């Protein structure tokens, strides 16, 4: 069981900034770890894949920013929408940008293929959070 989970998405790109690739993930506030993540476009389908990965965890309180798709997907659940309660996951986004140059907004480092982009970020999350 997860008492408080923060959810957010982080922007990245593959090849050119017009080819966006989003990292959606959930962060356990109490354990300070990433619970699940998925890559894809910034759509309801990608959010649905993340929610299906999170369904076995029985999250009590969801904390997100004001993105409208979170509101529609979390209807009927205890859902807090405030920037104040997403500070930890936003800090984690900053840590990811600092540790992985390919996530930097203005960087000469970038991914050239979707597969490599997903594997590098997934491997980093695996080492830091899943082991």
From Swiss-Prot:
**What GO molecular function annotations does the UniProt record carry, in alphabetical order?**
DNA binding; transposase activity
Q: Which GO terms describe its biological process?
A: DNA transposition
Q: InterPro entries annotated for this entry?
A: Transposase_27, Transposase_27_IS1
What keywords tag this UniProt record? DNA recombination, Transposable element, Transposition
**At the top level of its lineage, which domain of life is listed?**
Bacteria
Which cysteine pairs are joined by S-S bonds? none
Q: Family per UniProt? A: Belongs to the transposase 27 family.
What is this protein for, i.e. what is its function? Absolutely required for transposition of IS1.
This one is known as: Insertion element iso-IS1d protein InsB
Species this chain originates from: Shigella dysenteriae
């Amino acid at each position: 069981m997860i008492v408080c989970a923060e959810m957010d998405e982080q922007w990245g790109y593959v090849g050119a900034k017009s080819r966006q690739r989003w990292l959606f993930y959930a962060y356990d506030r109490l354990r300070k770890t990433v619970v699940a993540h998925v890559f894809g476009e910034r759509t309801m389908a990608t959010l649905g894949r993340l929610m299906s990965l999170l369904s076995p965890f029985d999250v009590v309180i969801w904390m997100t920013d004001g993105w409208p798709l979170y509101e529609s997907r979390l209807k009927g659940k205890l859902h807090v929408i405030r920037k104040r309660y997403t500070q930890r996951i936003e800090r984690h986004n900053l840590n990811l940008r600092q540790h992985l140059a390919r996530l930097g907004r203005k960087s000469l480092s970038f991914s050239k293929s979707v597969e490599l982009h997903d594997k590098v970020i997934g491997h980093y999350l695996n080492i830091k959070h899943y082991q």
